[in-house]
Regions:
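ADP-ribose/adenylate-binding Rossmann-like module
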Residues: 76-80, 85-111
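A short, basic/flexible loop-to-alpha-helix module at the beginning of a structural domain
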Residues: 1-11, 111-112
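Short beta-strand and adjoining strand-loop segment in the mid-core
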Residues: 36-40, 74-82, 120-129
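Glycine-rich adenosine-cofactor-binding loop
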Residues: 7-29, 155-157
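Short, conserved active-site loop motifs that form the nucleotide-linked donor/cofactor pocket
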Residues: 58-60
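Conserved SAM/SAH-binding loop
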Residues: 63-68
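NAD(P)-binding Rossmann-fold cofactor-contacting core
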Residues: 27, 35-53
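An accessory alpha-helical subdomain
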Residues: 128-157
Length: 157
């Protein structure tokens, strides 16, 4: 695998499409909502967490299968379905950043193991070579940062 360029994206107001179902997809949807993206979720079924986000107006849920027009105006797409290859091709034509879960050849970006604590965000990646090591490193970071974050102002003298 080639070198992946680490980047933190400002997704506020950007249309992001999510296709698929399951616990991991629900986590991705929540992460996009937390990043203030405009989330469009396309799938006949949804996890309870996604249903709640849709009911609260934080996610637009289309209760159907993917259609090519769903990619129009998208900045980013996350997919986990039988059509990963086709959706990747269509996304590439539109210059949409795409991630197909557990399908590296159909990804333009990947998710690292992420630790968030207030304004501190640490993302760790092994380019898919050792995911367990990335998780272990995230856990170590969590324990280390718990003592040091947030930074304390110097004492007043």
């Amino acid at each position: 695998m080639n070198f992946r360029y680490p980047i933190f994206l400002d997704l506020s107001g950007k249309k992001c499409l999510v296709i698929g179902e399951g616990h991991e997809i629900a986590g991705k949807v929540q992460g996009l909502v937390d990043a203030e993206a405009r989330v469009s979720y396309v799938n006949p079924r949804a996890e309870p967490a996604i249903q709640a986000l849709a009911a609260a107006g934080q996610v637009s849920w289309e209760r159907r299968n993917f259609a090519e027009l769903d990619l129009d105006g998208c900045f980013l797409a996350i997919v986990d379905c039988a059509d990963n290859a086709e959706i990747f091709r269509l996304a590439e034509e539109r210059q949409v950043l795409v991630n197909a879960a557990d399908d590296p050849k159909h990804c333009r970006f990947s998710f690292g193991s992420v630790h968030r604590q207030g304004d501190l965000t640490v993302a760790i990646s092994t380019n898919g070579v050792a995911p367990a090591l990335a998780v272990e490193s995230k856990v170590a970071c969590r324990y280390s940062s718990a003592k040091k974050w947030p930074p304390q102002p110097p004492p007043l003298t």
